[in-house]
């Protein structure tokens, strides 16, 4: 991703640094800060300074994994958001299940916030884990979701930076290494999963893709915990400490199923569900609105986030095939004098512009 600071002094790029498919090359994941006023001088930041904290960060949910995994090459920056005062940037590390905080003026990475995991066995978090059950059936399951946010947007509210993330999820799947496994292909701990044979049926958990890199802390022959990709939600995080402020739980999929009949793609239930991918914020009148693009549902969910601790669902908007990028244009910059939402959809190659009322 490439973006710029509000004061126009800096351009920032997220340089993901994905490995070659054979892992013979795995470049550093970095963020570049380009100083416009200094003749476009480039300062590139990596994450090697946090290598000594790897164990502590992993205990909180950071992921470092893969062939010959080193901390700095493992970090994969994805999307960036910048504070209105142009002093701070936050970067999603999607595969690593974390957000990094950057001081723009000192050109340094100051924090990495691991995001932890979402428990699908709690009320309100139920998911449909199967694409072979001939229905859309949400149920509580003994699985945890890795948030793994893709897009990120920032809102300053009551003097506090709040980070909105679209928790799409992502898989490392290359010719030399693939982390994803279906639950039916894993050995499950008989004490934790006494009903493993039933759980492994295709219509239950058998088809659900999970990571093989987590869930076996004792390194024996079976898995004690299961972790799937993404959280099928959008979340709000405290930008100062990375603490979770709000999560939409399973509301995106519940609303998709209830309001947009025939839109929910049950064929994606075994992967990442509706795959919230894009998110943008903006004032419509006096209300702060969040727009959440769901790639696999071909929808944008619209929320009133004037109180970001208690977002309120408004409606879903049917878009093109696989909405990818979302851009909000405030009314004062709009040629129609009304706020606009621009949605780019990757599968049908369209860009659509919606005018708010």
Segments predicted by a language model, with ranges:
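Beta-sheet-rich non-transmembrane sensory/scaffold domains
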Residues: 1-357
